[in-house]
Structures are given as C-alpha cells and as structure tokens.
From Swiss-Prot:
The gene is ureC. Belongs to the metallo-dependent hydrolases superfamily. Urease alpha subunit family. This is Urease subunit alpha. GO terms for molecular function: nickel cation binding; urease activity. Heterotrimer of UreA (gamma), UreB (beta) and UreC (alpha) subunits. Three heterotrimers associate to form the active enzyme.
C-alpha cells in the first residue's frame, strides 16, 4: 500500500525528507530520522490504533509508560527526528516506537491501560527552556515564563526591592530560606543565586550552606578584583557556578583586570556584549576565553532599528539612576553601542556567544527568551546565509545551535544538565509541544515532570475544549501536591547534605547542582567558538580573528505583529 507524503503528514506528521517551517521565519528543519515503523504507527481516537488488543497491550502499569507522546517531531541539540516519546515516573523513559509489543515490531515503548496519550502528530516537541538570568522581582513572572515554554528559572532576588530590581542576588541565609519556601508554590524548577560581592569567604559560604546554587557578582555591589577572586574561591570549594555583571565604569580596573582576577576559573558572564552592563566598551572580549561561559540577555536580541532607543530609559530605571545627574546619564550612554550590539548578533551565529536569557524586569522580558532567540536566528540567516553545517534544503544545524542556547547549555553551565535541558532518556520530563505555525511564539502544551502544567484552553463552559476565547491557563500539575511532585527546587550540595530542604519543610522535589567548576566553553554544545576579539576604543568596531563584525539593524522581524496585538 502506498500513501502520498501529504496524506501521510496530515495523518501522522512529517517523516524523513519532509521539511517544516518554524513559525513565519525563513528557518526550515528537515526530518533526519523516523523511529516509528511505517504501517505500524500508533494514533489515538475513534477507529484508530491505540485500542485494546491493537496498539494497546495487556501489560500492567509497571511495564508500560505513564504517558506517550505519539509521532512528535523532536527538535533538540542532538538532532531533528520523528518519534514516539514515553514518560514514566516524571521522567523521559524512552524515545522510539510505541505500541503493543505482543503484536507490533520494534516497540520499545509499551502502551497499556495505564497509559495516557498526548497527540504529537504535526507538532514540534522541544525541551523546556532554561532562563538563567532571573531577577525575582514579582512571583507573576513565573507564570509568564511558563506560558512561554520556560520550565526552569535561575537567579536571585527577594521581590521589588531596589537591590533585586538591579541585581540577581538573594542576599543572606534568611532571605534564601524565605525564597526557597516560596518556590514550593510554583510549577517551575527554581534555583537561587546569592550575593557574591564580598572579599572574605564567610558571608558567601553562609549563603551556599543556606541553599544558594550559585553566587552573583554585580557591579552595583562592587565587582572588584578582590570580590571576584574570593567569590570564585568559594565556588571552587562548593562546586557551584558564579555569574558576573562586570564593572561598566572601569573603576576598579579594565576588562583585562577582571579577566586576570578569574585566574582561569570557570565563570558565567551575563550580557557579555555590554548593553546590560559590563566593562565599557570591550567586555565583549570575554567571549574569547575558554573559562568564560558567555550569555546574552534578550533586549538586544536581535539588533533592530528600535534597540538603541529603548535601552537608555530601561537602564535609568533598572539601575536607580537619575536623568538629572550628568554622570548618571553618561554612565547609561556608555553602555549602549550600536557596533557591539551588531557584533553580538554575529557572535551568536558563529557560536561564540553560548546562551540567551531574559534579565527579567531588569532590562529584559521574561516571556520572550525563546521568541528572541529564534528571531536572532532568522535575522542571521537572512543577512549571512546558510551555516556550513546546514544541509542544502534545511537549517538543521543552525536550529540545533540556537535551541542549545536556552536549553542544554544553561543546564551544563549551572550544573543541572543531569536533570534537565534536553529531550533525552532519564531526564525530567519538562517538555513543550508547539504547532509549527506558532513555534517559538505560543506553545500549545507545557509539561512539567511528565504532567501537563499549562496549556492553551478554550471557553471553560464550551461543549468542547476549543471554542474562543482561547488563552493560557494553568493545568492540574500547577496545583497542590502535583506541582511538588513535578517541579524541582535546586540547592547546593552543601545545603542538601546539611538537610536544609527538611529543615525548611520544602515539599517540592529537590535537585542538587554538580559539575559546575570543570565546565569549559568548549563543553557548551554547538556554541564553543573561541575567537580573538578586538574592540576599537574610538569607534567601537568589533573584530573576531581579524574579521570586522557588522550587520544592519532589522526593520522587520518574524514572530512579531502576526502573533501579538501589542
């Protein structure tokens, strides 16, 4: 029996050789491999395959998966494949072929009466996003991020205090305890960073022992060489990550001074281009060092005709500056440079910048990490053409490079890749399903720990779930004990060993960070390029390995007005 490609795709989703457009971008992914078996595909519904004695076996709950996502198109750092995905006990059990092993060939995901079915036909499946630059200014950020496809948030803060409005620091053991307790309320994986600005170990170690999974150095607290050295020394002892916002004013030294203070030790440099803060005008040089793990924040992603104009006001508010004070205005203007922002686009496309995050409500938009990542990818394809690793008919390599920037690479950087960050067997089942036309913009279904935490949902009084108005709503995994079983609170090894989760009465599952200190930039997948960066101090032009980096700002972006009223 034969069936046309179009009919097959309509029924079971695309297969090998089919291409799928990502939203309204110029990015196309092509199916590289299909793990399902032609003629033996499983699908749920009236007259379909997943019925008793057909695609559903007689096996008990212990031998079948809890949930199967059928015929999904998986996009992850490791490839673009069509497969069924089996979930068991909150984790991804297997990727492959689902069905009834008694009568079907090649089944490695058994379906039984104890199995729920999520229809993945015609859908793109990705890992949940990881945002590692969160100012915990208000709890409502968490729902906004979740509805955008982000399932892990790392950062610091205590609410709308001046310190939190500017820095991602949960300062001190008392505040750390309160924030860890608050994290129980949310269907989101959460880890908190403490304040790293101190020149002696005690106040930093207290925060690590209280549960901090990392320490944040910020210029507003004084990112001096002494503070940097001490903070990294504490991190080395406790296997946690350090994030840094460097000294824009070059008061305690220049970029070379800060790089020297690192002493070759691993560090995550926030907004490494500099508009979000850092040595003016050349913090961007840091992306060329093996121990530096560089990220961007999303307001400069990508470079558009509006980017420069909006940044000045943002900066004045976020860093408690006064527009009536000339020195404050000069400080702000020193950070906003067309040339380095343009270079940032290209450095992402080359894989020299490795991650993208939000800088939520503090010069960044918590719900736009994923959208702005793909807007950057589209802009770069239109301006720079295909990448060397792409096929003649697809942008698979570029897609894998860019999705790694907000999934696996942040997970590796912050020591949580053993739990989250990719669609791989054994990992926490934090997964997002997208209709291709809405990919990267509006997810259809968000799973946390194998259960549905959020979804588009129609009129609650409708006779079916689809009538308008359709908007995002929390689902059952967002409530009560279910959220405790399906979301993680991350803590340091020291805090876990000391019994901090029990002492605080935490109810969520606990994840423990590890492997932070040995990470090198070359470990960051598809994003490990180490260029030699030069910045002209007079005109701010940027060169990488001698090549001038410049691109025009975009006048129009995809994933924008077609999808949003505002």
């Amino acid at each position: 029996m034969k069936i046309s490609r179009q009919a097959y795709a309509d029924m079971f989703g695309p297969t090998v050789g089919d291409r799928v457009r990502l939203a309204d971008t110029d990015l196309w992914i092509e199916v590289e491999r299909d793990f399902t078996v032609y003629g033996e595909e499983v699908k749920f519904g009236g007259g379909k395959v997943i019925r008793d004695g057909m695609g559903q076996s007689q096996l008990g709950a212990a031998q079948v998966v809890d949930t199967v996502i059928t015929n999904a198109l998986i996009l992850d750092h490791w490839g673009v494949v069509k497969a069924d995905v089996g979930l068991k006990d909150g984790r991804i059990q297997a990727i492959g072929k689902a069905g009834n092993p008694d009568i079907q060939p090649g089944v490695n995901i058994a379906i039984g009466a104890g199995t729920e079915v999520i229809a993945g036909e015609g859908m793109i499946l990705t890992a949940g996003g990881i945002d590692t630059h969160i100012h915990f200014i208000c709890p409502q950020q968490i729902e906004e991020a979740l509805m955008s496809g982000v399932t892990t948030m790392i950062g610091g803060g205590t609410g709308p205090a001046a310190g939190t409005n500017a820095t991602t620091c949960t300062s001190g053991p008392w505040h750390m305890a309160r924030m860890l307790q608050a994290a129980d309320a949310f269907p989101m994986n959460i880890g908190f960073t403490g304040k790293g600005n101190a020149s002696l170990p005690l106040p930093l170690e207290e925060q690590v022992l209280a549960g901090a999974i990392g320490l944040k150095l910020h210029e507003d607290w004084g990112s001096t060489p002494a503070a940097i050295d001490n903070c990294l020394e504490v991190a080395e002892r406790h296997d946690i990550q350090v994030a840094i916002h460097t000294d824009t004013l070059n008061e305690s030294g220049f970029v070379e001074t800060t790089l020297g203070a690192f002493k070759g030790r691993t560090i995550h440099t926030y907004h490494t281009e500099g508009a979000g803060g850092g040595h003016a005008p050349d913090i961007i040089k840091a992306c060329g060092f093996a121990n530096v793990l560089p990220s961007s924040t999303n307001p400069t992603r990508p470079f558009t005709r509006n980017t420069i104009d909006e940044h000045l006001d943002m900066l004045m508010v976020c860093h408690h500056l006064d527009p009536a004070i000339a020195e404050d205005v000069a400080f702000a203007e020193s950070r906003i440079r067309r040339e380095t922002i343009a270079a940032e686009d290209i450095l992402h496309d080359l894989g020299a910048f490795s991650m993208i995050s939000s800088d939520s409500q503090a010069m960044g938009r918590v719900g736009e990490v994923i959208t702005r990542t793909w807007q950057t990818a589209d802009k770069m394809k239109r301006q720079r053409g295909r990448l060397d690793g792409d096929g003649a008919r697809n942008d698979n390599f570029r897609a894998r490079r860019y999705i790694a920037k907000y999934t696996i690479n942040p997970a590796i950087t912050h020591g949580i890749s053993h739990e989250v960050g990719s669609v791989e067997a054994g990992k926490w089942a934090d997964l997002v399903l997208w209709r291709p036309a809405f990919f990267g913009v509006k997810p259809s279904l968000i799973l946390k720990g194998g259960a549905i935490a959020a979804s588009l949902m129609g009129d609650i009084n409708g006779s079916i779930p689809t009538p308008q108005p359709v908007h995002y709503r929390p689902m059952f995994a967002s409530y009560a004990g279910s959220r405790h079983a399906t979301s993680l609170t991350f803590v340091s090894q020291a805090a876990f060993a000391a019994g901090v989760p029990q002492q605080l009465g935490l109810r969520k599952a606990i994840g423990v960070v590890s492997g932070c200190r040995g990470v090198q930039k070359t470990d960051l997948i598809h994003n490990g390029y180490l260029p030699t960066i030069e910045v002209d101090a007079q005109n701010y032009q940027v060169r990488a390995d001698g090549q001038l980096l410049w691109c025009e700002p975009a006048d129009v972006l995809p994933m924008a007005q077609r999808y949003f009223l505002f």
